[in-house]
Regions:
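Glycoside hydrolase catalytic-domain context in secreted enzymes
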Residues: 16-709, 717-731, 738
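Bacterial Sec-dependent N-terminal signal peptides
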Residues: 1-24
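Short beta-strand edge segments in extracellular beta-sheet folds
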Residues: 739-743
């Protein structure tokens, strides 16, 4: 009987899957469900970790208690478990194998925060597509990415996993990842389902401490934290993951307003929602459920379809249904969403790992794309004419704990990266250094936190023999990511002392940072003649470093997050709101505070007495080896209506002596509205590549609907009024024009 059922289901799917019409998928799902028992249905709402006793896993599969398994990356094991599910489980429903694939599978890409610095939607999409090719080759069909939590506090370790502080940039890049993972069709063997996470507000953890309380008002959710998720819904993302945090006192995994009223009813999302690891059971420590039975009821009814690893659904739903506390209709709807995804992925038609004659893993094209993305993700923060290194350089000293740290340069969540395939900076320099140029490599610190007593005499002695000094500093991969928050963002260990020792030699010093977050680097920038921020650049980070330092590639990255002067400024971000006492920007000199003067003598502005209110480096900032000039800003239609777009033209000229790429950025702002609004917001950007001396007119389009916000009555829409338009190469300064929105 079971064999007949499996054959019937596969035949049924084969007949309808290619067209991928929603109605046909729904018909398939209903046919499958008509043959499922209650136990089968409950099993389809349960996800487990495969890194456990495989005998136990096999037994659970045979009982129909497993819908999805994560963290198995052996194709033969995946096929073996899948065969048990298809041939021996009661319903014959295939398993969906999943993995946290945040920035590359085997070939590790720059961390997402670094990718965001590229402002290159197309390249990020291509890199994500390569990731899907690698992962699906061994049977992974569901990736827990992209992560799009807006983060404005670099103390939070998971800032590394997202696209920074700006909703517009995060929206565009998250959509690029979704398109890369899912391709043109989920049923394609080369595609895998993306998962928009973490819904929502997780990046607003108080104090930057992971899993901490978040306070995000409804208006801020709509204006700041919702946009990337809504953009992914519109792009067809297959799944969502709820977050660990609460929103206005209700944990996200059990928040019906978020998971049903907003996500499904308001935005029209039809895919499935999975909890984060154990977050269904997490309602107990949150204090809103007395046990897992109550947590299961709350979360399922809220709209969380699949329970990741808390076993709350598996162990309690049958009893809840029997007692009448959970409706069978609610269970059925959750099962439909899970099965719909499996059908769309073609799992019934082709449940096993695809066979390939030639592996794409670590292939030439994949590595080249990863290298290019690492180049474009790197941000040149300072250059006193030392870079790129020229033919006059005959001896190079390379040092620092990140110069040969293959594991650490991959960054957080590089679960399947292999350091044996990772090219470090010193390896790339040694491999590519022109003949006649001598390399001196000094392993001055074993790792970034190394506090070994060292006066660096040997290092300074070696440095005096070199024409240029290159120091690779930063943080280990374990210093960022989940549960890895920091209160002190300065360089750890003896790294700053090492840089001081190098600078004392008087030789030109190039400092290259590899880190998972913005660090506090004001003093290090002063010590250095050039500063390149590479984030954690991934597998090809070493080659990218060589290419950038020697001018084989020209830096074009722009900061996707504001760099603070010190931790006391945090949170600091460019799109802050108007206040009643706006800082002038000249405040912050403690030495100028007079003695025994009236309280009001210093004025009344939103500032500090001991540090300037401005950041060390603004959002959107990044230098190049060439220079650019923007001119002739014009707005095509100075007055627009709600259905229009604001079309902007600006001339961009490469005024330097080499080819380069500039990111032209358009910001809007308004001085009056029904609610307080940000002083400026990024609304468009365009990467433009220009040869030396070349000038080009760049067109930017801002749909008026993108100017919508959460109004005073909490409705979503635009308001008529006058807008300021600023077009520049960062969030500070630029050319200014105006337009008016009429209703």
């Amino acid at each position: 009987m079971k064999k007949y059922l499996i054959t019937f289901l596969l035949a049924f799917c084969l007949a309808f899957i290619p067209s991928a019409a929603h109605q046909e998928v729904d018909n398939i799902v209903e046919e499958i469900m008509s043959r499922m028992s209650l136990d089968d249905k409950i099993g389809q709402l349960h996800q487990i970790d495969g890194r456990t006793d495989l005998t136990k896993v096999c037994d659970m599969i045979r009982k129909g208690q497993v819908s999805s398994i994560m963290n198995i990356v052996d194709a033969s094991v995946i096929d073996s478990l899948q065969r048990i599910a298809v041939e021996e489980s009661p319903s014959g429903i295939p398993i969906l194998f999943a993995r946290d694939i945040v920035h590359g599978f085997k070939t590790i890409l720059p961390i997402p925060l670094g990718q965001a610095a590229s402002f290159d939607d197309a390249l990020i999409c291509s890199a994500a597509r390569n990731t899907a090719l690698e992962a699906t080759e061994i049977g992974i069909k569901w990736a827990f990415a992209p992560m799009m939590d807006i983060a404005r506090d670099p103390r939070w370790g998971r800032i590394a996993e997202g696209f920074g502080e700006d909703p517009y940039l995060a929206s565009r890049l998250a959509v690029s990842v979704v398109k890369g993972y899912q391709g043109d069709s989920l049923s394609d063997e080369l595609s895998m389902a993306a998962c928009a996470k973490h819904f929502v507000g997780y990046g607003a953890a108080e104090g930057g401490r992971d899993y901490n309380t978040t306070y995000v008002p409804v208006r801020s959710l709509y204006d700041t934290y919702f946009p990337p998720f809504k953009a992914c819904v519109e792009a067809g993302v297959a799944s969502f993951m709820s977050s660990f945090n609460d929103n206005d006192g209700v944990p996200a995994t059990g928040n019906r307003w978020l998971l049903t009223e907003v996500l499904r009813d308001e935005w029209g999302f039809t895919g499935m929602v999975v909890s984060d690891w154990g977050s269904v059971g997490g309602l107990i420590p949150h204090g809103v459920a007395k046990d897992k039975k109550e947590a299961a009821k709350i979360c399922l009814e809220a709209g969380c379809d699949m329970d990741m690893m808390s076993y709350s659904y598996l162990n309690n739903l049958k009893e809840l249904i029997a007692e009448g506390d959970v409706s069978m209709d609610v269970v059925d709807e959750a099962v439909r969403r899970v099965l719909r995804l499996k059908v769309r992925l073609g799992l019934f038609e082709k449940p096993y790992t695809r066979k390939t004659s030639e592996s794409v893993i670590y292939s030439e094209n994949v590595l080249e794309t990863a290298c290019r993305l690492a180049e474009e993700s790197s941000v040149l923060l300072k250059n006193d004419g030392i870079l790129p290194l020229g033919e006059d350089i005959k001896t190079v000293l390379v040092t620092g704990p990140m110069a040969d740290a293959a594991y650490d340069q991959m960054g957080t969540w590089a679960l399947d990266g292999d350091k044996a395939h990772t090219l470090t900076p010193v390896e790339a320099i040694r491999k590519n250094l022109p003949s006649g140029v001598k390399l001196i490599y000094v392993n001055s610190l074993d790792y970034p936190r190394d506090k070994s007593p060292d006066d660096f005499k040997a290092l300074k002695k070696a440095a005096r023999k070199a024409d240029v000094l290159i120091a690779f500093v930063g943080e280990e991969q374990m210093m960022s990511g989940e549960a890895h928050s920091l209160s002190d963002l300065h360089l750890q260990g003896q790294q700053s002392e090492m840089l001081e020792a190098l600078a004392s030699t008087g030789k030109p010093l190039v400092t290259v940072f590899m880190a998972g977050r913005p660090l506090v680097i004001a003093s290090e920038m002063e010590l250095s003649d050039a500063v390149l921020y590479m984030w954690h650049p991934g597998t090809m980070g070493g080659q990218a470093a060589y290419n950038l330092l020697w001018g084989k590639a020209n830096p074009s990255g722009k900061l996707p997050v504001t760099f603070p002067r010190n931790e006391g400024q945090i949170p600091i971000y460019y799109n802050h709101k108007h206040t009643s006492h706006i800082a002038k920007g000249t405040e912050g000199n403690l030495d100028n505070v007079p003695r025994e003067m009236p309280q009001s003598v210093m004025g009344h502005t939103s500032s500090y007495l001991d540090v300037a209110p401005t950041p060390l480096l603004p959002f959107g900032f990044g230098l190049s080896y060439t220079t650019f000039e923007l001119s002739h800003l014009r707005v095509e239609t100075p007055e627009v209506r709600a259905s229009d777009s604001v079309v902007v033209y600006v001339d961009v000229k490469n005024t330097g002596d080499r080819q380069g790429c500039e990111v032209v950025q358009a910001y809007t702002g308004r001085k009056s509205a029904s609610t307080t609004r940000p002083m400026k917001e990024l609304k468009a950007y365009e990467r433009v590549s220009l040869e030396a001396g070349e000038c080009r007119t760049v067109r930017l389009e801002i749909p008026v609907e993108s100017l919508a916000f959460c109004r005073k009555d909490l409705s979503w829409g635009t308001e008529p009024g006058n807008y300021v338009l600023t077009v520049g190469t960062s969030s500070e300064g630029g050319l200014v024009s105006y337009f008016k929105l009429n209703h």
